[in-house]
Regions:
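Short loop/turn microsegments at loop-to-beta-strand junctions
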Residues: 47-49, 128
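Helix-hairpin-helix
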Residues: 1-9
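Active-site-proximal loop/helix of nucleotide/amide-processing enzymes and allied scaffolds
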Residues: 4-5, 34, 56, 66, ...
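Short loop/turn motifs at secondary-structure junctions and domain boundaries
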Residues: 41-44
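Long, charged amphipathic helices and adjacent flexible linkers at domain junctions
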Residues: 12-33
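Short hydrophobic alpha-helical segments used for membrane anchoring or interfacial signaling
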Residues: 51-54
Length: 147
């Protein structure tokens, strides 16, 4: 039964990923959020996921960059931007989960998001958004006015 559920989850994530990320990623923000929610909201530890995008906002790479503990995933802006340069990315979408179930951003979430955005600007790499997903929903830091 568990193997069947894992297969079903994998198929669902594949379908959501294809729908959300096949064209320009910014074309359907709700589809991207739905994919990230399905992929991350129920994970038992914090993860930082990075969507690396090209100049046409098409996906170059969807990568789990960092896996942390139950309440923290250390974000290293230098490493995120180094990887962006390696990939030839011109834009990013960050996403991380809150295993606590509450997607509200912490002060540190906001500070690090702004740090990545500012450092990225110097390298011509735009941070389009940072989504925080949890079992109870998701929040866009851009829509929330934090970016």
């Amino acid at each position: 039964m568990l193997a069947w559920l894992a297969t079903l989850r994998s198929a669902m994530l594949h379908a959501l990923r294809r729908e959300a990320l096949q064209g320009p990623v910014l074309g359907d923000a709700d589809a991207v959020a739905a994919y990230l929610f399905a992929a991350m909201a129920h994970e038992p530890v914090e993860q930082l996921r990075v969507l690396y995008l090209n100049a046409r906002n098409r996906l170059l790479l969807d990568e789990t960059a960092i896996e942390g503990s139950v309440n923290v995933a250390p974000i290293y802006p230098r490493e995120i931007l180094r990887r962006s340069l390696e990939m030839g990315a011109t834009a990013l979408i960050l996403a991380h989960n809150h295993p606590s179930g509450d997607p509200k951003p912490s002060r540190e979430d906001i500070r690090l998001t702004r740090l990545v955005a500012t450092a990225g600007e110097a390298l011509d790499i735009r941070l389009h958004d940072h989504l925080i997903v949890a079992r109870s929903g998701w929040i866009s830091l851009r829509a929330g006015g934090y970016l």
